[in-house]
Amino acid sequence: MDLAALRAKTPDHWKLATAIRVLAIDAVQAANSGHPGMPMGMADVATVLFRNHLKFDAKAPNWADRDRFVLSAGHGSMLLYALLHLTGYEQATLDEVKNFRQWGARMAGHPEYGHLEGVETTTGPLGQGISTAVGMAIAEKSMAARFGKKLVDHKIWVIAGDGCLMEGISQEAIGLAGKQELDNLIVLWDNNNITIDGRVTVSDVTDQKARFAASGWDVLSCDGHDAEDIDRALTAAKKAKRPVLVDCKTLIGFGSPNKADSYAVHGAPLGDAEIKLTREAYGWEHGPFVIPAEIKAEWEAIGAKGAAERAEWEARLAALPAGKRAEFERQMARGVAPKLAGAIRAFKKAQSEAAPKVATRKASEMVLAAVNPVVPETIGGSADLTGSNLTKTSDIEDFMPGNHKGRYMRYGIREHAMAAAMNGMWLHGGVRPYGGTFFCFTDYARGAMRLSSLMGVPTVYVMTHDSIGLGEDGPTHQPVEHLAICRATPNTWTFRPADVIETAEAWELALSSERTPSVLALSRQNLPTLRTKHEAKNLTAKGAYVIAEAEGKRQAILMATGSEVEIALKARALLQAEAIGTRVVSMPCMELFAAQDEAYRKRILPAGGVRVAVEAAIRQPWDRWLLGERGMERKAGFVGMEGFGASAPAERLYAEFGITPEAIAAKVKSLL
């Protein structure tokens, strides 16, 4: 490629793009770690995007109506960091660029949400960014429908690489976006034909443009190093009536004489000698991390070009009726709906009196019927299991082309994209997403669920059919290890409610959470209401509490969750009949219990006596409460699952696997 000809054709563009490239090269070299090739290859596309098309104001990084820019190919993080520094984001200082990938740095190896303003989402696991962006596009459409396009009218731009498009989640996401006709979503494909193993063709022959077209997208192409051709394609993309893929043909490591267009430049520093040659090829005579003042000033002018449009937008916002403005600002700031607590309180009181015997998945539906009318920002959904997850209430309609006021997503059999899209909805602002599937299929959503926890995104995962209690569908659908997996994930609340009251309390906590996602593990089988005396306080917020106290001298404590709390209470009755004083502790959320002060934990689980945990899942998460926290191994037992389940009616399964009142009582007596 003739670099001199490109430099001569668009000299102003060349200087701006070269500033990105050299910052990326220098930061990776200084860190002795990173990925310079992608920023070098996509600098031209990014320059045209930020200079001519992206709506943003670097001095107001959280402006509600800004365009969102998602770097799905997160390994190329220095592309984003260089842009944020050059355009004048306050937190993106040159010192931070120099501190790339170091302890305490805002500029982490892969972009991390919450570390640096301008980073819209955490990326790095390939395919997550493009899928999260689909959720952002859905949220934009929802907010525009509710508040009007004078307040909400922006695009979601994504840079994705070959690896993003190979990941299975990408097909789920592009299929969902195509079905929803999300014309506010534009994906810029860094088509450099290189992976770590070599040419893309060593592992893939997919016609990506045909794949996107078949999924309902418009497809455009450009020379990713020709500023005028890039501008033409991006201008056309903004006018499309469907989501757009722009095929940007690029060279990875553009300008490196010996490493461009090879995997050698993907994930390692260029080295001093190659950097010298590359600078010469660019015509860049400045030292490491030196950006001439006139180039920095031009970039900062680009960063300020949205200020006037933002001021006009703020005037429109200020002119709204006070109530509408306050509600818009609350939803964008992700504030808790003011009527939520009252709705939950009234629901609990009514259900304590009615004492229904319902599955907790049905209880969840009942809670949502009370909550959705007073929390207008909820958008629910299911991965093709609406009738089983019971996630749709009668007051909400489907979100679809032509009805963006709808608050229910038909995700199809796309668990992973559903989870990522929900992350994107919350990150955009204005939406509280929840979505359902069978608990066993958290396996299909795991990558995005982990990012919920890592980012501090309070997505609500409605996971029904939570144990062998689902019955005849058998071990392929019966979760036994999944509670342990969710509980092992940092910054996750895993709720397994025992009845309709605990279900309501779990929902209140999930919809009030600021920075922690929630998993609601809900039963298929009917469970009785255990708390028939109304308690205004949210007992689930403590994580665990005494649901039945020992009569006489306490000799044993039974700990249980979900459907097994009822079984534990029946075991208590057997033990009490033999004068064995037994306390039953319901533990709907281990994480919240662990967060309580030691005095409370000691009050619920005092030292001495036998402890038995009961749960139709594996033992692994329970040893903290059985062996630790004042427990003793010789006095500790577990009644639950040791392996996978089986296909049979639920009642038979509980009997065959020994999760019965009689087995629990026998376990206690064997430990006395």
From Swiss-Prot:
Catalytic activity line of the entry: D-sedoheptulose 7-phosphate + D-glyceraldehyde 3-phosphate = aldehydo-D-ribose 5-phosphate + D-xylulose 5-phosphate
Gene, per the UniProt record: tktA
Catalytic site: E415
Pathway assigned in UniProt: Carbohydrate biosynthesis; Calvin cycle; Carbohydrate degradation; pentose phosphate pathway
Statement: the UniProt record of this protein carries the keyword Transferase: yes
Biological process, per Gene Ontology: pentose-phosphate shunt; reductive pentose-phosphate cycle
One Gene Ontology CC term in the entry: cytosol
SMART domains: Transket_pyr (SM00861)
Record-listed thiamine diphosphate binding positions: H75, G124, P125, L126, G163, N192, H266, F441
UniProt: substrate binding residues: H35, H266, R361, S388, H465, D473, R524
GO MF term set: metal ion binding; transketolase activity
Residues flagged as site, Important for catalytic activity: H35, H266
Subunit and interaction comment: Homodimer.
Primary enzyme class: transferase
Note describing how the cofactor binds: Binds 1 Mg(2+) ion per subunit. Can also utilize other divalent metal cations, such as Ca(2+), Mn(2+) and Co(2+).
Protein name: Transketolase
Family: Belongs to the transketolase family.
Keyword Magnesium among record annotations: yes
